[in-house]
Swiss-Prot record:
One of its GO terms (biological process) is malate metabolic process. InterPro entries: L-lactate/malate_DH, Lactate/malate_DH_C, Lactate/malate_DH_N, Lactate_DH/Glyco_Ohase_4_C, Malate_DH_type2, NAD(P)-bd_dom_sf. Belongs to the LDH/MDH superfamily. MDH type 2 family. This is Malate dehydrogenase. It catalyses: (S)-malate + NAD(+) = oxaloacetate + NADH + H(+). The gene is mdh. Disulfide bonds: none annotated. It comes from Burkholderia ambifaria (strain ATCC BAA-244 / DSM 16087 / CCUG 44356 / LMG 19182 / AMMD). Its EC number is 1.1.1.37. Substrate binds at R93, R99, N132, R163. It is an enzyme of class 1 (oxidoreductase). The active site is at H188 (proton acceptor). Pfam families: Ldh_1_C, Ldh_1_N.
């Protein structure tokens, strides 16, 4: 017997990331090849015609799992009974725009979306914020949805995680799928800290295999941190397909589990690892039965502490920059 359809809301539905995302969701890559989905697509009034064009293409794929599509510019319609919400749309930084103005512009969007989720989404909704600044946007949405569990709100660090995996595979000569126990700490920004001290490849310690502190400090960490900028420089456009792929990975693992493997998610802090409560901070997690659980008790050396505190400082600055815009 067919499963009842799950409702997946996607914001910024006319955008580049969504264009790489929607067809894969409809194909079963997000929730499984036996799970029908209803897509609930949100974008601005002026983007509705473009969204309709994307839906025409979705129709033309005749996906067996696509049970319906809703197109709207109203968050309360888009998030109605949503089981998953992918918050992809955000205000991009325009030329000459100060960071604080970017934070304020996004705070307006994510307070409205958080409040709408609070009002109409499933109480078990899984929220992933992709739109930047992702961690702080997720924090704003979470704070605007007091009736939903905080744990429902996450930010995407999976792109950083996947970028780090790829760099480590290239450096070590090991297959990317063989690398386990990688962590990426902190903010989805150039300050984040990819940490392979615990990582293994085919059971061997990657740290011993690579054995190059200078490469770690001067090449690996900056390459992962600045990868997005490098792609814009090369392509003239920001990374969309790889971001969509990471969003799929993040939610699929959250829903279907990681079989004991570590992945990175931006989640509300419980105070562990010296991160103040509620800050949405990238940590290694293991997912099982639709829940994530942070990997606990990892040793933090002096270099790691410095890196983790550096990315935390940026997140605290962002939090303080939007505090006056939040009610609670």
């Amino acid at each position: 017997m067919a499963k009842p359809a799950k409702r997946v809301a996607v914001t910024g539905a006319a955008g580049q990331i969504a264009y790489s995302l929607l067809f894969r969701i409809a194909n079963g890559d997000l929730l499984g090849k036996d799970q029908p989905v209803i897509l609930q697509l949100l974008d601005l009034p002026q983007a509705q015609a473009a969204v309709k064009g994307v839906v025409m293409e979705l129709d033309d794929c005749a996906f067996p799992l696509l049970a319906g599509v809703v197109i709207t510019d109203d968050p309360k319609v888009a998030f109605k009974d949503a089981d998953v919400a992918l918050l992809v749309g955000a205000r991009p930084r325009s030329k000459g725009m100060e960071r604080k103005d970017l934070l304020s512009a996004n705070a307006e969007i994510f307070t409205v979306q958080g409040a709408a989720l609070n009002e109409v989404a499933s109480r078990d909704v899984k929220v992933l914020v992709v739109g930047n600044p992702a961690n702080t946007n997720a924090y704003i949405a979470m704070k605007s949805a007091p009736d939903l569990p905080k744990k429902n709100f996450t930010a995407m660090l999976r792109l950083d995680h996947n970028r780090a995996l790829s760099q480590l595979a290239a450096k070590s000569g090991k297959p990317v799928a063989s690398i386990e126990k990688l962590a990426v700490w902190g903010n989805h920004s150039p300050t984040m800290y990819p940490d392979f001290r615990f990582a293994t490849a085919e059971g061997e310690s990657l740290l011993k295999l690579i054995n190059d502190d200078v490469w770690n400090r001067d090449t690996f960490i900056p390459t992962v941190g600045k990868r997005g900028a490098a792609i814009i420089e090369a392509r003239g456009l920001s990374s969309a397909a790889s971001a969509a792929n990471a969003a799929i990975d993040h939610v699929r693992d959250w829903v279907l589990g990681t079989n004991g493997k570590w992945v990175t998610m931006g989640i509300p802090s419980d105070g562990s690892y010296g991160i103040p409560e509620d800050i949405i901070y990238g940590v290694p997690v293991v997912c099982e039965n639709g829940e994530y659980k942070r990997v606990e008790g990892l040793e933090i050396d002096a270099f790691s502490r410095e890196k983790m505190d550096g990315t935390l400082a940026e997140l605290l600055e962002e939090r303080d920059g939007v505090a006056h815009l939040l009610k609670n």
